C-alpha cells in the first residue's frame, strides 16, 4: 500500500507541475497583445532564439552550419578554413531541444514558437517526477514527494522553466536526477542481470542528456558516483567493471571522449592561470 500511495502522489506532483505551467500559458493567452506576435507566443529568455533558429533551419531542411556561420562570424569562417571542410555538423552536435521542437511543430501547423512553449508543461511534469523517483530509490518515498513538489514549484526552478523559457534548463535537472537515480538503483537492486540492465538504461539517458545539453562533462561525476557506490556497497569487482564499461558504452563514445577532453582543457587552463 505504501509504495502504491507514493507512486500515486508522484503522479499527482507531476500533474501539478504540469498544471502550474499550463495555467501560466492560459494567462499568456488572455494577454495576447503583450505575449503574442502574429498569433505566435513570444519568448522570455535570451537563449530561446538560438534554439528556435536551429529548429527553423531543421524545419526548412537547411544546413544548421549556416546558422552557426552567421552567429559566430567571422570566427566560424576561420575555423572552417582551417579544417578545409564544409561538411554538415553531425545531428548529435545539434541539441536535442531544437530537434524536438521541429518534430512537434508538425502537430501545431509548423508553428515553432507554439510547439516550443507547449513542450514546457510536459518538461515540468518529467522533471518533478524524476526528482521524486530519485528520492524513492534512496528509500525516502514520502520525502521524495515533498522534494518533487518543492523543487518543481521553487522560485529558482519555476522561473527558469516557465512559459517562454525555451532553453535546455527545461530538462537539465530532471535528466540529472533521473540518471543518478538509475545509477543508484543499479547498485541497490539484487541480481546481476537487473544491475546490468539498469546501468545500461542509465547510460542511455546520459547519452540523451549529453545530446540535449551539449556538455558531456557530467559523465565524469556520474562515473565517480558509480565507483563510490560500488566501493561502499562492497560490490564484486567483476560486475563493477562490467557496469562501468556498459555505462560508458551506452553514454556514447563521443560523449566519453568529449568529457575527458573537456577535463584536460580545464586542467590546462587552470594550470596556466595558476602559473601567472
Where are these regions (language model features)?
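Hydrophobic core of alpha-helical transmembrane segments in multi-pass integral membrane proteins
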Residues: 8-15, 248-254, 276
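Sec/Tat-exported extracytoplasmic proteins
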Residues: 58-63, 107, 126, 133
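Membrane-embedded helix bundles of polyisoprenyl
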Residues: 72, 119-134, 143-190, 195-231, ...
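Membrane-interfacial entry segments at the cytosolic side of transmembrane helices
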Residues: 1, 194-197, 235-245, 269-270
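Loop-to-helix entry region of an early transmembrane alpha helix in multi-pass inner-membrane enzymes
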Residues: 80-99, 107-129, 162-170
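Extracytoplasmic catalytic/substrate-binding loops of multi-pass membrane glycan-assembly enzymes
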Residues: 21-34, 40-54, 63-76, 88-100
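Alpha-helical transmembrane segments at the extracellular/periplasmic loop-to-helix junctions
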Residues: 268-276
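Start-transfer (signal-anchor) and selected internal transmembrane alpha helices
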Residues: 1-35, 125, 136-137, 144-145
